[in-house]
């Protein structure tokens, strides 16, 4: 790049920074490079496909305008994903100096230097505690968690330098369905060798570490240590709070993914439903592999119970639970895996303390408070949009579009009404999920349908039919 092109590129970046603001610039444009300038086009590059897609979708006109202020003849911006190898070569350029220093050391000293372990940044960060029981060996696989288990296993078995297949890996489910088990299994497996540095943090631990680094003026060391991790595992992301902390998490996420490092995240809902998180973070998370762990089926619950009995026998060899009792527990305790484990612990305690064998009568008495009423099905806005679109013979994209024809407006209003009555989503969130509409539009739709169903029998029947379909 010539000096003239370098100066011009610096001015364009300055215009872009002023136009979009420092936060947006840092998140999306800080890693954009100038590759070439031709007569009517400019060739730019970014390190990931996600950045390319996001910039092209949201900022292509703005980038072009900033260039045209410098070069009016430019009519096209070409944005490509640069090779990871190029970035690696650039970052490793200072290495020869280190090699030259080693060449002048005595042989014994050089061998000592080569054998020394790498600085343990992940130890210095103080990861969250790990439960030694939560490994892949103790994880019970069933229909509801097969994909999540396979993806987590793929991450855990990766080696430094391998291409990353899906990044970030985002696992979500309700409480007690195995998210933390999988994340800790990834960490145990990843740290079993010395090749990779794998760090497991809860969102609260991440927040605590970042805030503490600000107070002690060690935030730079905190950031550098985090970004030296090969695999970063973050649990309970729904608890990540604070604008500054979220911005730092977003920067860390971008830095690790752009460097080809793996990120694994778990939360209790999909990325789009994390309303407290900045949109940039939600978008970045949604750009990887998003996997839902569904509620445990009866067959899987039975498998979990059997595995817990086997685990209990390692310390209590005579402990036994009849098959009929296990089948009863699998049918009766449907809430989550923690309740299943709690049931086995209660039976073990009662059996040992009272020197009595486990019976069905004992089990019914001991676990009675773990048998909860069946919870209503959790309905998603995407499900509502899909069912409504099918009912009214329109497409889901029609519901999200700006079309105002009668055959689209009424289904859209019905879908918004159902989203408000069947989910816990706020009006602004519902509006955002319907093509970025304002909350007042949603409120108008809800009131409109509420008024009509009390007078229009046909519409009332349609709405009730849709509710039944969604709740089945």
Swiss-Prot record:
Spans annotated as Disordered: 89-127
GO biological process annotation, one example: regulation of DNA replication
Chain spans, region Domain III, AAA+ region: 129-351
Domain I, interacts with DnaA modulators, as annotated region: 1-73
Protein's organism: Rhodopseudomonas palustris (strain BisB5)
Region feature (Domain IV, binds dsDNA): 352-472
Residues that hold ATP according to the record: 176, 178-180
HAMAP family from the UniProt entry: DnaA_bact
Domain notes: Domain I is involved in oligomerization and binding regulators, domain II is flexibile and of varying length in different bacteria, domain III forms the AAA+ region, while domain IV binds dsDNA.
Keywords per UniProt: ATP-binding, Cytoplasm, DNA replication, DNA-binding, Lipid-binding, Nucleotide-binding
Entry protein name: Chromosomal replication initiator protein DnaA
């Amino acid at each position: 790049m010539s000096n003239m092109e370098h100066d011009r590129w610096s001015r364009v970046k300055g215009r872009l920074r002023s136009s979009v603001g420092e936060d947006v610039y840092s998140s999306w444009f800080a890693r954009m490079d100038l590759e070439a300038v031709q007569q009517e086009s400019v060739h730019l590059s970014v390190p990931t496909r996600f950045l390319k897609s996001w910039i092209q979708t949201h900022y292509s006109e703005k980038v072009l305008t900033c260039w045209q202020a410098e070069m009016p003849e430019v009519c096209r911006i070409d944005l490509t994903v640069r090779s990871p190898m190029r970035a690696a070569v650039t970052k490793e350029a200072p290495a020869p100096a280190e090699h030259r220093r080693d060449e002048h050391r005595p042989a014994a000293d050089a061998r000592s230097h080569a054998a020394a372990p790498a600085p343990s940044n992940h130890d210095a960060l103080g990861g969250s505690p790990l439960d030694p029981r939560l490994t892949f060996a103790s994880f019970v696989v069933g229909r509801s968690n097969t994909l999540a288990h396979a993806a987590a296993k793929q991450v855990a078995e990766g080696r430094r330098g391998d291409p990353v297949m899906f990044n970030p890996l985002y696992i979500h489910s309700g409480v007690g369905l195995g998210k933390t088990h999988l994340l800790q299994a990834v960490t145990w497996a990843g740290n079993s060798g010395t090749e990779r540095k794998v760090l497991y943090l809860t969102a609260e631990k991440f927040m605590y570490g970042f805030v503490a680094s600000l107070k002690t003026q060690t935030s730079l060391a905190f950031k550098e240590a985090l970004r030296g991790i090969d695999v970063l595992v973050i649990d309970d992301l729904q608890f990540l709070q604070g604008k500054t902390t979220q911005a730092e998490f977003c920067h860390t996420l971008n830095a690790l993914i752009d460097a080809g490092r793996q990120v694994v995240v778990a939360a209790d809902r999909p990325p789009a439903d994390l309303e407290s998180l900045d949109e940039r973070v939600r978008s970045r998370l949604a750009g990887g592999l998003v996997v839902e762990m569904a509620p445990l089926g009866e067959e899987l619950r039975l498998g979990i119970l059997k595995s817990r009995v086997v685990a209990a026998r390692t310390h209590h060899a005579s402990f036994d639970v009849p098959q009929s009792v296990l089948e009863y527990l699998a049918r009766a305790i449907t809430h989550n895996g923690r309740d299943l484990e709690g049931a086995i612990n209660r039976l073990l305690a009662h059996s040992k303390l009272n020197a009595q064998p486990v019976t069905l009568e004992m089990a019914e008495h001991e676990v009675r408070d773990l048998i909860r009423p069946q919870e209503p099905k959790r309905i998603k806005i995407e499900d509502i949009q899909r069912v409504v679109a099918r009912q009214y013979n329109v497409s889901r994209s029609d519901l999200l579009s700006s079309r105002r024809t009668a055959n689209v407006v009424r289904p859209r209003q019905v879908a918004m009404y159902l989203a408000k009555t069947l989910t816990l989503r706020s009006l602004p969130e519902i509006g955002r999920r319907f093509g970025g509409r304002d909350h007042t539009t949603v409120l108008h739709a809800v009131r409109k349908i509420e008024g009509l169903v009390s007078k229009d029998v046909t519409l009332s029947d349609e709405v009730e039919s849709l509710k039944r379909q969604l709740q089945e």
